[in-house]
């Protein structure tokens, strides 16, 4: 046992000794209690809690950890023998045993080294080192020296144990190296606090261009387990609130906090430690100044140096741990919210306008939530820190502390007033963003039809006007943001002058003033942080309210009843109501509709009324009716998708599980053809080849260079309409289902393909009837040509009422409506078996290995294209100053110079008052002051007020000037680049990628960029000023600045090479996720019918986790840089304190100014890192937008566009000489297989009416696209190879070309939901009366009346049938023609060019006659080129109830038959019909069936 006779004070608690050891040590009793007993008690208690948590988990580790436990057990008895008190001996033994036990359980049940054990061992090691020093200083006898030596050995063993405990388990010699985890999930507290686990990623990013595959996966806790738990919590909170009829705004916040409680609490402990360490900075300043002013032992200086190391080193470590845990929390918040939004999107009804909001909520709103929650823990921590600082300040300056506190209270009042309005303005702004993104996404997804329609420039103008309206709506939020920031800066800038003015002269000593300034800094800086956080936090809560409102929307209510013989409901999905035999249904019945009515806008406006229908297994049920009769509505009603219904729809259980559904508009995913067909079904090669043959795709797959591995582009951009339709048919055939619903699937197909499909799929001898469990088939159509072979026929009239139903035999026994339709359409009653057999397609002979090989090579090419997109490899690593020029190009140079000047002025005016205070104190300490206090105080306050005004100017320029001007310019450039991009660009670039430019990228440009620019510029300027103050405190420190700047430059360069790439990967990785959302929005009915919602949810989780990886790692790399800078500040603090205490030749004035600057520069460097991190992410968005704007993908060389005369084309003559073209990019080495047109030669005289026909995929629509400069010829084509009225179209400005040529696409494009009828026609409208006249001509005025009564009513395009959509497209063309005629100031030829791409593919016989009459009447003097599969009107004119048999009186005087991109027949239809072996004759005879 040690004796205390050498130092009597060792027997007391102390804590400091007196009269021995230089009066610079703790007493032994204090060390035993504080260094041994207290830590052992706390550690033992926490150990039992930790072991209890660990044993509840499953074992994850194998291997042997006996060596580590032996080391700790060896250390324990060595440790406790020196203790002189029995309590310390017992607790030391218990701590040693619990250390071994905890190490054992952590090894078996935890992936990472024990944090609790690592912290305890490290802290106890530091305390043991201090105690070891005491033992050696107190040793006098041989026994005591021996004991001290043994304890030193014990300290060395503990140091080794600390090193072992910090190692990842897989790297220990006895660990399990087979466990593969992410670096941070296996790292100990030392690696986490220093971010050493990132060193591999940083090295990799410095050496090479990073790809997503180079990034480690996220920790398992960030995956689906947390998301599922959040979903359950949110459902429970919303359900309880609904049951209690509460309308709380924070239900989503409660659900998040409940789900992430542990992650929410983890940052608390290091943040509390930061509070204590921050306050310790002020007391360190006071202690150093007292040491310089008073005569104290030199040993105290070493204590101050040690305290500096502990305080600033502790700040670095605690800051790192705090941000590590907090960034993980933010990552999980984003994942939970995005997952919930996607899940809710799956549940919304087809008519919900909120589906288009999902992308905005997931991008813009979640980003603002992330920004607002970034300082979530800072709120309470800053309040605590400010409260403690205020108390210490009161003790330091007395009553003078009331002055800054009054200013703080006024600031609180101002922030409260501002905060009340932030949410209101923020919601209005977000609504504008949501509207713009919805319009943009709708336009991009329909860009092909938009270009064909000639609406590019009008729609571009509409979107840009929407953008400018959005920027105007942001002004209110920006002004509030400026007010909030100024209020936040005010206390920090003006409080010191107010406090010094209230301070008594007798309290004006250096150490008191500088200590008060330090405490005031600890008061105002946290409060300023709170004030700056209020606006983003209120914005975050406003966005959370928007997401909560989205999640609380009514879900799709499936009114269908599922029947089966037992009450088992396990297979029922969604909201379907399940009953055990609610109605008598025979085993052969799949669906029964009983006295049902269906509608989209309310039960009083039902589209279908009093429907009774039975659909049987192994039977084909044909639903026949004219345009707008409700055929598509009935199909969707059988799927449970109609929002309003009455009566009953009963499904047999087998028919309800999976339903094969083909919509009129095919749902095509942006993947390979094979993946589109197979979907999420199990792979069956026999079934796959079977459905490919049946859907007549084998020929197309042989013609495509990559076969079924061909990527089809967003919405099937590279495919023809018929190919898309047949892929959708093949998908429904491949699906293992007992019910198929086919909505007018044969429209848009050529006659031969149509017959082939019906014969091989739907006929009595077709594929479906031959299957073992033949499904029930519902087939809607406007034609009666296949009614004879239907098992059940269901006829509808134009009012949505059933006329008659029954089998063919039943309906043909009397004068039925069916027979009148057959007579009207002149349908031959020929049996299918009597038709000439369709040429057998060559079987698809492609092995799966070839397909996979092709697909893998395609992926490699895509990856290379992705890497090259946005910026080249060098720019991704080293940056591009051109990005800043691109952003500021629209800003006047005077504004930029003013911004830089105001920022630098702020930096000088903020830092110089510390030097002024030093001069003031020197003058005050002199016996005869040169100036009164008012002089010094007034100038001091003047500097601070000028600094505030400089910052106000900086904010105004960035937020209201740069943001509005540059935001509009950058958007306009990007939008122009997209609308003028060639068609192949949209086939190769995903829809989600393009949408991401206008959602997340544009959001960063609007919000994060100007705010981070202000913060970065101000903090850099202030940091430079503080560095000057530090240099003034010690010339030796100033001498080290060149080395410091060199090190900072190297660290920053090392950091930027990785962070730049991560920021681009962060933006790029979200594009597939956005594309997935948009894909879901377009195909939700098909996905729900096939019961693929679970698979889509899993896929969304995978895409979400992939998108999280670069964002999470970018945040961590930014925190690594913060740790390096904090370490740098720690070294500066160490050198500063060491120099001023050891040399002691600078006086307290400069030392105090230097220490105050040291406190402030740490905070400024933290803000610099934070603001630069946001700035570089925002500039990454600008970089992507710049790359898009400067993309080489252009329809015409910028600046070389030719604008033809206003009246062009006035005749419509066309000349095409030897042109070959491909959908691929302009490449002379294009595979000939990919040619869409081959050596095309075509001359069309003015005024000719030309019909183009041929099998689907033969190149008919390609001719239309060629004339519209959307399909460009090969590069070696002559410039005058394509002319219209003698002018080559290759250099004509493409948007102008498409405006001058009137074209009607197969699929009509509409503006987003909510736009009026007039707005949808307004780009070409002359007046409302003209619009009404045109709509009446095409029989759409009754639809207008039904939807609201006039042209200002909202046009609900979802309720329009495909035929009505095509009528609207024709109405637009008529309106354009009339507008052109009225715009001519002088008489001019009234001719022109009209292109129609299957304009009547989805209409019935009578409506088609109407459309042809309108075309003949309105465009009689025009050259008309029509692509059509329906040949009845090529050779004869039909009128209602009357047929002309004179084939010489046909609408068209010329027919082109196209096959494989080549014109194989050309002539008058009558002449071509005379050729019995001709292609046109074969097509025409097939159409007569």
Swiss-Prot record:
Membrane topology label: Multi-pass membrane protein
Residue ranges constituting the ABC transporter domain according to the UniProt record: 591-823, 1214-1485
Keyword Transport included in the entry's annotation: yes
Compartments where found: Cell membrane
Phenotype on disruption: Does not affect the production of fumonisins B1 and B2, but strongly decreases the production of fumonisin B3. Causes overproduction of fumonisin B1 in the mycelium and supernatant. Increases the expression of FUM8, FUM17 and FUM18.
Matches recorded under InterPro entries: AAA+_ATPase, ABC1_TM_dom, ABC1_TM_sf, ABC_transporter-like_ATP-bd, ABC_transporter-like_CS, ABC_transporter_C-like, ABCC_6TM_D1, ABCC_6TM_D2
Record carries keyword Cell membrane: yes
Function: ABC transporter that may provide the dual role of fumonisin export and self-protection by allowing the fungus to evade the harmful effect of its own fumonisin production. Plays a role in the repression of the gene cluster that mediates fumonisin biosynthesis.
Protein name as catalogued: ABC transporter FUM19
Gene: FUM19
């Amino acid at each position: 046992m040690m004796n205390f006779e050498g130092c009597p004070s060792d027997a007391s608690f102390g804590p400091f000794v007196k009269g021995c050891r230089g009066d610079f040590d703790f007493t032994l009793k204090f060390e035993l209690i504080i260094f041994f007993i207290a830590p052992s008690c706390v550690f033992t208690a926490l150990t039992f809690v930790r072991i209890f948590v660990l044993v509840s988990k499953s074992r994850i580790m194998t291997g042997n950890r006996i060596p580590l436990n032996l080391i700790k057990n060896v250390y324990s008895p060595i440790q406790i023998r020196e203790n002189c008190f029995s309590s310390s001996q017992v607790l030391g033994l218990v701590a040693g045993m619990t250390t071994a036990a905890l190490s054992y359980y952590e090894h078996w049940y935890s992936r990472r080294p024990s944090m609790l054990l690592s912290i305890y061992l490290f802290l106890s090691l530091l305390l043991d080192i201090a105690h070891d020093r005491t033992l050696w200083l107190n040793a006098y006898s041989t026994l005591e020296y021996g004991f001290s030596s043994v304890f030193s050995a014990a300290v060395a063993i503990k140091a080794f144990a600390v090193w072992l405990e910090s190692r990842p388990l897989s790297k220990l010699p006895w660990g399990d190296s087979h466990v593969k985890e992410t670096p941070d999930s296996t790292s100990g507290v030392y690696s986490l606090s220093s971010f050493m686990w990132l060193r591999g990623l940083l090295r990799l990013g410095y050496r090479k261009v990073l790809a997503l595959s180079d990034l480690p996966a996220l920790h398992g806790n960030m995956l689906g387990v947390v998301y599922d738990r959040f979903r359950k919590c949110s459902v429970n909170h919303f359900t309880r609130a609904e049951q209690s009829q509460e309308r709380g705004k924070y239900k989503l916040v409660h659900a998040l906090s409940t789900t992430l409680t542990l992650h929410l609490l983890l940052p608390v402990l290091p943040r509390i430690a930061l509070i204590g360490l921050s306050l310790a900075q002020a007391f360190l300043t006071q202690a150093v100044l007292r040491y310089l002013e008073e005569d104290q032992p030199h040993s105290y200086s070493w204590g101050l140096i040690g305290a500096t190391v502990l305080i600033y080193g502790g700040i670095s470590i605690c800051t790192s741990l705090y941000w590590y845990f907090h960034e993980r929390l933010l990552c999980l918040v984003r994942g939970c919210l995005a997952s919930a939004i996607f899940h809710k999107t799956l549940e919304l009804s087809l008519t919900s306008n909120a589906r288009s909001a999902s992308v905005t909520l997931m991008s813009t709103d979640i980003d603002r939530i992330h920004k607002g929650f970034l300082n979530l823990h800072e709120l309470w921590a800053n309040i605590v820190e400010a409260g403690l600082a205020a108390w210490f300040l009161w003790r330091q300056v007395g009553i003078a502390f009331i002055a800054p506190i009054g200013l703080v209270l006024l600031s609180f009042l101002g922030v409260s007033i501002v905060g009340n309005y932030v949410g209101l303005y923020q919601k209005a702004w977000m609504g504008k963003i949501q509207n713009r993104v919805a319009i943009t996404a709708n336009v991009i997804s329909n860009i092909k039809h938009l270009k064909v329609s000639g609406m590019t420039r009008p729609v571009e103008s509409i979107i840009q006007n929407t953008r400018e309206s959005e920027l105007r709506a942001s002004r209110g939020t920006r002004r509030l943001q400026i007010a909030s920031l100024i209020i936040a800066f005010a206390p920090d800038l003006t409080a010191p002058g107010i406090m010094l003015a209230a301070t008594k002269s007798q309290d004006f000593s250096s150490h008191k003033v500088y200590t008060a300034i330090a405490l005031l800094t600890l008061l105002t800086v946290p409060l300023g942080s709170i004030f700056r956080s209020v606006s983003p936090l209120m914005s975050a809560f406003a966005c959370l309210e928007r997401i909560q409102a989205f999640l609380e929307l009514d879900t799709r209510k499936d009114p269908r009843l599922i029947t089966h013989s037992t009450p088992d409901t396990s297979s029922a999905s969604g909201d379907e109501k399940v009953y055990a035999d609610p109605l008598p249904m025979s085993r052969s019945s799949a669906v029964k509709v009983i006295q049902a009515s269906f509608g989209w806008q309310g039960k009083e406006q039902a589209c279908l009324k009093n429907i009774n229908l039975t659909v049987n297994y192994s039977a084909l049920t044909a639903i026949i009716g004219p345009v707008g009769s409700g055929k598509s509505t009935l199909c969707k009603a059988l799927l449970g998708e109609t929002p309003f219904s009455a009566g009953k729809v009963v499904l047999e259980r087998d028919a309800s599980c999976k339903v094969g559904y083909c919509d009129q508009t095919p749902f095509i995913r942006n993947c390979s053809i094979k993946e589109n067909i197979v979907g999420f079904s199990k792979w069956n090669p026999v079934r796959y080849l079977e459905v490919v043959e049946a859907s007549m795709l084998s020929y197309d797959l042989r013609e495509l260079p990559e076969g079924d591995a061909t990527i089809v582009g967003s919405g099937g951009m590279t495919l023809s309409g018929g190919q898309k339709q047949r892929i959708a048919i093949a998908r429904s055939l491949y699906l293992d289902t007992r019910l198929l619903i086919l909505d007018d699937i044969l429209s848009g197909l050529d006659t031969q393909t149509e017959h082939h499909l019906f014969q091989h799929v739907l006929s009595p001898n077709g594929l479906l009837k031959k299957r073992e469990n033949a499904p029930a088939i519902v087939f809607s159509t406007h034609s009666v040509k296949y009614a004879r072979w239907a098992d059940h026929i269901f006829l509808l009239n134009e009012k949505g009422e059933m006329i008659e139903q029954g089998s063919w035999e039943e309906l043909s026994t009397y004068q039925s409506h069916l027979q009148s339709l057959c007579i009207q359409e002149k349908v031959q009653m020929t049996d299918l078996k009597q038709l000439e057999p369709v040429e057998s397609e060559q079987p698809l002979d492609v092995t799966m290995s070839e397909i996979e090989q092709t697909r893998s090579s395609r992926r490699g090419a895509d990856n290379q294209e992705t890497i090259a997109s946005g910026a080249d490899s060098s720019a991704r690593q080293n940056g591009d100053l051109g990005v800043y020029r691109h952003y500021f190009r629209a800003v006047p140079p005077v504004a930029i110079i003013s911004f830089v000047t105001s920022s630098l002025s702020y930096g000088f005016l903020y830092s110089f008052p510390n030097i002024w205070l030093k001069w003031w104190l020197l003058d005050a300490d002199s016996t005869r002051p040169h100036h009164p206090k008012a002089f010094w105080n007034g100038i001091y306050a003047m500097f601070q007020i000028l600094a505030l005004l400089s910052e106000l100017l900086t904010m105004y320029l960035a937020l209201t000037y740069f943001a509005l001007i540059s935001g509009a310019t950058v958007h306009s450039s990007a939008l122009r680049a997209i609308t003028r991009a060639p068609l192949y660009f949209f086939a190769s670039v995903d829809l989600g990628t393009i949408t991401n430019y206008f959602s997340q990228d544009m959001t960063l440009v609007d919000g994060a960029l100007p705010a981070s620019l202000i913060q970065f510029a101000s903090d850099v300027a202030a940091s430079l000023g503080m560095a000057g103050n530090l240099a003034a405190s010690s010339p030796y420190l100033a001498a080290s600045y060149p080395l410091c700047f060199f090190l900072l430059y190297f660290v920053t360069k090392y950091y930027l090479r990785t962070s730049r790439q991560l920021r681009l990967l962060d933006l790029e990785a979200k594009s597939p996720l956005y594309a997935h959302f948009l894909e879901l929005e377009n195909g939700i009915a098909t996905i729900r019918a096939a019961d693929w919602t679970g698979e889509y949810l899993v896929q969304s989780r995978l895409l979400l986790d992939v998108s999280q990886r670069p964002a999470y790692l970018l945040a961590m790399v930014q925190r690594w840089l913060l740790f390096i800078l904090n370490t740098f500040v720690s070294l500066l603090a160490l050198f500063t304190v060491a120099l001023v205490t050891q040399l002691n030749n600078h006086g307290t004035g400069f030392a105090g100014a230097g220490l105050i600057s040291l406190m402030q520069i740490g905070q400024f460097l933290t803000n610099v890192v934070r603001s630069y991190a946001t700035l570089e992410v925002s500039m990454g968005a600008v970089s992507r937008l710049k790359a898009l704007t400067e993309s080489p993908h252009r329809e015409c060389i910028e600046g070389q566009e030719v604008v033809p005369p206003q009246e062009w084309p006035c005749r419509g003559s066309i000349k095409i000489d030897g042109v070959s073209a491909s959908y691929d990019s302009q490449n002379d080495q294009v595979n000939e297989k990919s040619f869409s047109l081959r050596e095309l030669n075509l001359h069309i005289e003015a005024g000719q009416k030309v019909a183009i026909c041929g099998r689907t995929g033969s190149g008919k629509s390609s001719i239309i696209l060629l004339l519209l400069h959307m399909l460009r010829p090969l590069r070696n084509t002559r410039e005058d190879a394509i002319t219209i009225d003698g002018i080559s179209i290759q250099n004509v400005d493409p948007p102008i070309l498409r405006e001058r040529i009137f074209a009607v696409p197969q699929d009509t494009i509409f503006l987003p939901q909510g736009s009026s009828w007039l707005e949808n026609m307004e780009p070409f409208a002359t007046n409302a009366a003209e619009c009404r006249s045109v709509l009446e001509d095409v029989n759409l005025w009754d639809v207008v009346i039904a939807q609201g009564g006039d042209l200002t009513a909202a046009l609900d395009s979802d309720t329009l049938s495909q035929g009505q959509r095509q009528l609207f497209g024709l109405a637009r063309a008529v309106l354009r023609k009339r507008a052109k005629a009225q715009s001519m100031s002088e008489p001019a030829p009234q001719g022109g060019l009209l292109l129609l791409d299957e304009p009547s593919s989805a209409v019935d016989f009578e409506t088609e006659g109407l459309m042809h009459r309108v075309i003949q009447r309105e465009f009689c003097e025009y050259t008309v080129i029509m692509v059509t599969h329906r040949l009845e009107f090529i050779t004869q004119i039909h009128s209602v109830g009357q047929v002309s048999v004179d084939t010489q009186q046909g609408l068209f005087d010329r027919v082109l038959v196209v096959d494989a991109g080549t014109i194989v027949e050309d002539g008058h239809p009558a002449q071509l019909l005379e050729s019995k072996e001709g292609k046109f004759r074969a097509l025409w005879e097939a159409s007569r069936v």
